[in-house]
């Protein structure tokens, strides 16, 4: 009985740190979250050579998204943004994974072309804060807080 309660409580504890989401682009990646409340345009908004946000009006201006897990509401701007994401992958300046509140075709296409795991529609967002380490497992539709 004690053993059963222990494992049941452990399961509940672990599940509290998993967030369900929808798979957009296959894969699994782990990294530090960089969070923005603003949509981002990859064309003209992010330098594909460095992975630094260069849009002068964006709250992440000057921040690098290279090797981070990017959490944004969605994307905006030109369809060329998909190719900017692809160029970032080729330059090793892309984010490790992308989480969106609602995916849109530009970023989704870029993530798929670049083999960047991407999910959207997280069941909870309060835990997703700057600096939090997470694992995005889009194959199984979950984000795990580490």
Language model segments and positions:
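N-terminal amphipathic/basic-hydrophobic helices that include classical n-h-c signal peptides
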Residues: 1-17
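Feature captures the catalytic cores and cofactor-binding loops of soluble hydro-lyases/lyases
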Residues: 19-29, 33-142
């Amino acid at each position: 009985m004690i053993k059963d309660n222990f494992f049941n409580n452990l399961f509940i504890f672990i599940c509290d740190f998993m967030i369900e989401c929808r798979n957009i682009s296959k894969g699994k990646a782990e990294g530090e979250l960089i969070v923005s409340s603003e949509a981002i345009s990859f064309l003209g908004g992010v330098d594909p050579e460095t992975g630094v946000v260069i849009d002068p009006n964006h709250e992440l201006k000057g921040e690098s998204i290279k090797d981070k897990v990017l959490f944004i509401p969605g994307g905006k701007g030109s369809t060329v943004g998909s190719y900017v994401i692809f160029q970032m992958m080729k330059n090793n300046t892309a984010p490790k994974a992308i989480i969106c509140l609602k995916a849109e075709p530009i970023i989704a296409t870029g993530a798929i072309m670049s083999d960047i795991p991407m999910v959207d529609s997280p069941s909870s967002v309060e835990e997703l804060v700057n600096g939090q380490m997470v694992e995005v497992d889009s194959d199984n539709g979950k984000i795990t807080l580490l």
